[in-house]
């Protein structure tokens, strides 16, 4: 198998929604094209992660552009589609040059593929129908002529299209009834003939020698032969699905048994010598792995985070599957009370691959895919401490990507939002838990009239629109046409980091605390790289999701700067105990003042939510910090971790590390925890 890469690029992929309840979301994946497969992988920190899916080149039937939807966001301006035997994949390139390159490379590789489409759908499949023709079935015939078809279909290498030799036991049917005189079912019928002696295949004209022949109507799913013989078995060939191989059955007690087990319907017409057998539509055994569709898959969650979530569940056999630190590998994390431990124990089982590329946890039980492996072990422990009983999900009813209205604001319909309960309150109003369209959980920040100027409101909304990162709270839209104004964001179920530390901190390991700091650092590194200053980074302004991922929130004071520096107006309120010296002396903000605040946040995390400088008021803090006083080492922080947070508190901003440098310092401390 040729695994040499032809083309690699980070592209945006739309979920295929193979299940009715699957979310319609968009994710960046590293796409890799080889001679045999188009695969896509997770990609993080310049490293290829686990494979998320793969399509065999020989199964691809069409590759073409897709017409843009109305009000398409900037990042989805260059879509193309890949139609293959088992589905439809939409991919978005970053520019026209990239899209053209992928179309050219893919069309080159699928040249001569069987069953290329003459027509395709030029519009997206959205909300249960194609936008181009309004057909509601994803497998519906295309409505637009595919211009590339003629070139890709006719330029076929003879060797590539030659039928492989059938086994010797293939049944020969004497050509007693001329094929051309048979009742042809329809123009869409594909006629295949195979000469078992000359090893050649023919089109509609029959050869002179005896042939094994089969005729298949791809619309009605019927197969036509020359004589009704129920000791025969008609098998669709893997390489040419509309061609059928005719075999003698090895044994059968009666023709009725064979008929009942191999056909749904049989119609015999002896006057025309035509057989019509209906077969159920076959399904591919090589199912594409889309693990994100399964509740038990947690993705890039760490070992310590998985242990915390499983212990919170506290049920015998609670489990999840996560990406291993070894690229492309998976780990099953499983909770049990079987061991003499009051808290229970969590075991981590690596998913191994044998010489035949089968997956297993216990060597005697091997499977083609992760879902099949998990299904088996949900019923059999097979060497594990207990069987997999209760999947622990890290997924929630998240909102699909927002739909831009094209004017820089996402305006949502107020009547589509139902307010459920108050989550908290602040200087500008209250935050409520809500349901959007009766389905999706959202947080609604309700801005009281007069509490925020219109300019301030649009400043915060526009800032949030520009920021999209897994470690930043997602912005969904606004309701700005009447008061109270709504700012609608992602709902984060475990609330603010500060409260979580105070209520759950005693059950957290130092490695889990470090993971929380790393999450925040990732979000801040993103802001830093896009020249945004947060100005109010603290544990109270970060939120903890149900998978224990921590996300940076509260962008009310965030500013975009051209030179990494912002001077605030006199009289502006700021959080003194989280502020760098240049802030409380000169009102001067930069990403390095955010770094100072991050050091304070790390201290909050490792002290489980204590108030920094708790013995001093604000004026005393200004004096102490100006004199060189710094916070002490929390007892849960190692010397190495304390050195990292202490480096954030250098008096000179230029001597403090960047967030990217902080990530590099924390990463080695996480490595031992990721197995």
Curated annotation (Swiss-Prot):
Residues 417-675 form the Protein kinase domain. GO terms for molecular function: ATP binding; non-membrane spanning protein tyrosine kinase activity; protein tyrosine kinase activity; zinc ion binding. It is found in: Cytoplasm. GO terms for cellular component: cytosol; nucleoplasm; plasma membrane; ruffle membrane. Signal peptide: none annotated. Disulfide bonds: none annotated. One of its GO terms (biological process) is protein autophosphorylation. Keywords: Apoptosis, ATP-binding, Cell adhesion, Cytoplasm, Kinase, Metal-binding, Nucleotide-binding, Phosphoprotein, SH2 domain, Stress response, Transferase, Tyrosine-protein kinase, Zinc, Zinc-finger. It comes from the Eukaryota. Its main location: cytoplasm. It catalyses: L-tyrosyl-[protein] + ATP = O-phospho-L-tyrosyl-[protein] + ADP + H(+). A zinc finger (Btk-type) spans 113-149. Induction: Activated by IL6/interleukin-6 through phosphatidylinositol 3-kinase (PI3-kinase) pathway. It is likely that activation occurs through binding of phosphoinositides to the PH domain. Phosphorylated in response to protein I/II and to LPS. Phosphorylation at Tyr-566 by SRC and by autocatalysis leads to activation and is required for STAT3 phosphorylation by BMX. The active site is at residue 536. ATP binds at residues 423-431, 445. Binds 1 zinc ion per subunit. Zn(2+) binds at residues 121, 132-133, 143. A motif (CAV1-binding) lies at residues 596-603. InterPro entries: BMX_SH2, Kinase-like_dom_sf, Non-receptor_tyrosine_kinases, PH-like_dom_sf, PH_domain, Prot_kinase_dom, Protein_kinase_ATP_BS, Ser-Thr/Tyr_kinase_cat_dom. SUPFAM superfamilies: PH domain-like (SSF50729), Protein kinase-like (PK-like) (SSF56112), SH2 domain (SSF55550). The modification Phosphotyrosine is found at residues 216, 224, 566. SH2 domain mediates interaction with RUFY1. Interacts with BCAR1, CAV1, MYD88, PTK2/FAK1, RUFY1, RUFY2, STAT3, TIRAP and TNFRSF1B. Belongs to the protein kinase superfamily. Tyr protein kinase family. TEC subfamily. This is Cytoplasmic tyrosine-protein kinase BMX. The lineage of its organism: Eukaryota, Metazoa, Chordata, Craniata, Vertebrata.
């Amino acid at each position: 198998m040729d695994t040499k890469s032809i083309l690699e690029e980070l592209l945006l992929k739309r979920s295929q929604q193979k299940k009715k309840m699957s979310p319609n979301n968009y994710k960046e994946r590293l796409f890799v094209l080889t001679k045999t497969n188009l695969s896509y992988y997770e990609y993080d920190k310049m490293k290829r992660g686990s494979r998320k899916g793969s399509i065999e080149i020989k199964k691809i039937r069409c590759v073409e552009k897709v017409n843009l939807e109305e009000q398409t966001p900037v990042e989805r301006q260059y879509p193309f589609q890949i139609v293959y035997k088992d589905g439809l994949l939409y991919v978005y390139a970053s520019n026209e040059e990239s899209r053209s390159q992928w179309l050219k490379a893919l069309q080159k590789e699928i040249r001569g593929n069987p069953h290329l489409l003459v027509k395709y759908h030029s519009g997206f499949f959205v909300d249960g129908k194609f936008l181009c023709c309004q057909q509601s079935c994803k497998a519906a015939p295309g409505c637009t002529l595919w211009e590339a078809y003629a070139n890709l279909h006719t330029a076929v290498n003879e060797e590539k299209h030659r039928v492989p030799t059938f086994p010797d036991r293939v049944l020969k049917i004497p050509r007693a009834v001329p094929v051309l005189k048979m009742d042809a079912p329809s123009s869409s019928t594909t006629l295949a003939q195979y000469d078992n002696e000359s090893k050649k295949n023919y089109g509609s004209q029959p050869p002179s020698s005896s042939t094994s022949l089969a005729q298949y109507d791809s619309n009605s799913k019927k197969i036509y032969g020359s004589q009704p013989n129920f000791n025969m078995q008609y098998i669709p060939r893997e390489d040419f699905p509309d061609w059928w191989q005719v075999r003698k059955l090895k044994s059968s007690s009666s023709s009725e048994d064979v008929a009942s087990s191999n056909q749904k319907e049989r119609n015999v017409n002896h006057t025309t010598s035509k057989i019509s057998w209906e077969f159920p539509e076959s399904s591919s055994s090589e199912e594409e792995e889309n693990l994100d569709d399964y509740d038990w898959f947690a993705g890039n969650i760490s070992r310590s985070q998985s242990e915390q979530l499983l212990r919170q569940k506290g049920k015998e056999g609670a489990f999840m599957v996560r990406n291993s630190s070894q690229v492309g590998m998976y780990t099953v994390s499983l909770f049990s009370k079987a061991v003499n431990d009051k808290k229970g124990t969590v075991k981590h089982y690596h998913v191994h691959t044998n010489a035949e590329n089968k997956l297993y946890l216990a060597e005697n039980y091997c499977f083609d895919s992760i879902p099949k492996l998990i299904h088996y072990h949900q019923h059999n422990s097979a060497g594990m401490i207990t069987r997999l009983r209760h999947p622990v999900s890290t997924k929630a009813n998240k909102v699909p990507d927002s739909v831009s209205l094209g004017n820089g604001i996402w305006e949502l319909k107020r009547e589509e939002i139902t307010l459920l309960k108050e989550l908290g309150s602040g200087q500008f109003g209250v935050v409520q838990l809500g349901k959007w369209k009766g389905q999706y959980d959202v947080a609604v920040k309700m801005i009281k009239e007069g509490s925020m100027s219109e300019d301030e409101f649009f400043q915060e909304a526009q800032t949030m629109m520009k920021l999209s990162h897994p470690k930043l709270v997602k912005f969904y839209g606004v309701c700005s046409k009447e008061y109270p104004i709504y700012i609608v964001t992602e709902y984060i179920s475990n609330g603010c980091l500060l409260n979580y530390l105070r209520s759950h901190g005693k059950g957290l390991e130092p490695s889990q605390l470090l993971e929380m700091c790393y999450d925040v650092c990732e979000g801040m590194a993103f802001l830093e790289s896009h020249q945004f200053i947060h100005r109010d980074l603290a544990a109270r302004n970060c939120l903890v999701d149900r998978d224990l991922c921590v996300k940076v929130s509260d962008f009310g004071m965030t500013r975009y700067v051209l030179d990494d520096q912002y001077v605030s107006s006199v009289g502006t309120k700021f959080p003194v105990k989280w502020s760098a010296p240049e802030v409380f002396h000169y009102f001067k903000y930069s990403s390095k003042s955010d770094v100072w605040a991050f050091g304070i946040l790390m201290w909050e995390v490792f002290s489980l939510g204590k108030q920094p400088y708790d013995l001093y008021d604000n004026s005393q803090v200004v004096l102490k910090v100006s004199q060189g006083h710094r916070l002490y080492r929390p007892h849960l922080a190692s010397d190495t971790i304390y050195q990292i947070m202490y480096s954030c508190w250098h008096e000179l901003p230029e001597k403090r590390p960047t967030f990217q440098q902080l990530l590099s310092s924390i990463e080695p401390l996480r490595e031992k925890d990721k197995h």
